[in-house]
Amino acid sequence: MQPQDLDLNYGLLEDILKAFLQNEIRKFGFSSVVLGLSGGIDSAVVAELAVRALGPEHVLALKMPYKESSRESLEHADLMIRRLNIKAEERPVTPMADDFFRDVPEGERLRRGNIMARTRMVLLYDVSARDGSLVAGTSNKTELLLGYGTMFGDMASAVNPLGDLYKTQVRGLARHLGIPSILIDKAPSADLWEGQSDESDLGFSYGEVDLLLYMMLELRMEREAILGEGVSASFYDRVRKMVVRNQYKRLMPVIAKISGRTPGIDFRYARDWQEVR
Amino acid sequence: MQPQDLDLNYGLLEDILKAFLQNEIRKFGFSSVVLGLSGGIDSAVVAELAVRALGPEHVLALKMPYKESSRESLEHADLMIRRLNIKAEERPVTPMADDFFRDVPEGERLRRGNIMARTRMVLLYDVSARDGSLVAGTSNKTELLLGYGTMFGDMASAVNPLGDLYKTQVRGLARHLGIPSILIDKAPSADLWEGQSDESDLGFSYGEVDLLLYMMLELRMEREAILGEGVSASFYDRVRKMVVRNQYKRLMPVIAKISGRTPGIDFRYARDWQEVR
């Protein structure tokens, strides 16, 4: 298995994702999206797709730095804003985050990271209510499967064009879209503290884990067959456990079933239920 | 149709919900819950159930007042805390909420209400991470169906024992559990601003709408049959539209389907996937 095995027809993919954004946004009478533009590749790709799908006047980028956010991230976000000629607002999260942090010791990085991600969600959703727009999500499939994200934080959105694309495929799409290579080639980071990098956090590269997840999910290969491809047993077991343990992040809250029709269990209409039009 | 038609065997219901809490919490190695105790009937019932299911030492109540929260709400929350002999913490949301409110005009009550609900979610989830506990939800079925709640705010939880109970049934259960009648009989309020009441907000009573929802969902009665029960056409149409329009609040974010196995669409294991034990 090679990373190239995950490659997609990126021209066709661009068309599908543009149609997805147009359809899922306009069917409810909306015409615009707002997204958090972090300076990373995922949000850059979503911004690019949204502009191509809806037009630059219908895309608002929120820059939501914390006082410790890297200068580089903001510069890369500005690079995309100029490239796409879209409106942008800078809404620092420092005041709110620091209020929350008063009760959170400095070393509690995961708790602080979750608080920042959720503070950003509060801002994004308030701006979407202010403007009558929808929040575009930027979580990719690798993050969603590993649970490498914050519930009700960066994982919260109305429409997410990247949720079924491994990071490797987001990179391929980014190259196809002509996203500046400086954003594609730098080490991915959620920028939650200085020098933070996803891959050092996780202890493996996106390239490695994407191949493993692809073999597990898409190819449905058994453990022995995957180990036969040169994947170590410890890596396999660790990733499998991450996927299983984080299933709750991919589901609605558990509701105690009492009646014959329980929201989310057997009262499950599609989002665009027939009466809405 | 009479409100009594919605009545349940509340003794059996208590047993079912206690078993639900025990099972859904302990199966993942947790033993405790944290919940927002507002002084209202829903959170009082969840606190009571949690104590009976897990023991008072495993229930933490967070009181999260805003500077405009009613004194009465806090007193009623304290009433329950004494009754149940549980630990409690007061974490005012005023500093964080006011930071967010700087960009939100005074009159924008819905936006401010959503910000407060999400600020409380951030606190609840941080405390659950701090203590290694799960967040117990307090949204009832009437709220979930009408969309009368905040996504990623009060609707966010790990386990929700009330999600399949109409408000009428929560009241019945509250009486069975012996919840102080002062909490049962007062006008339900999310306490988002002074004098706020759900029923004046909604323009109808919980009793009326529960009967209508029950006929629509559980009894699957057609429009004409329901109007034949004395429900006005305008009330029927308005409630039906609320239920349909808020379906998105009961679903995970929409993900563009690209692969053969898309998180949430056809990669749908139960929350307690077999490997977790």
UniProtKB/Swiss-Prot annotation, chains A, B:
Protein name according to UniProt: NH(3)-dependent NAD(+) synthetase
Question: What's the subunit arrangement here?
Answer: Homodimer.
- What gene is this protein translated from? nadE
The entry marks the following residues as binding deamido-NAD(+), namely 118
Briefly, what is this protein's role?
Catalyzes the ATP-dependent amidation of deamido-NAD to form NAD. Uses ammonia as a nitrogen source.
EC main group: ligase
Gene3D superfamilies, alphabetized? HUPs
Looking up InterPro entries in the UniProt record yields: NAD/GMP_synthase, NAD_synthase, NH(3)-dep_NAD(+)_synth, Rossmann-like_a/b/a_fold
Q: List the disulfide bonds.
A: none
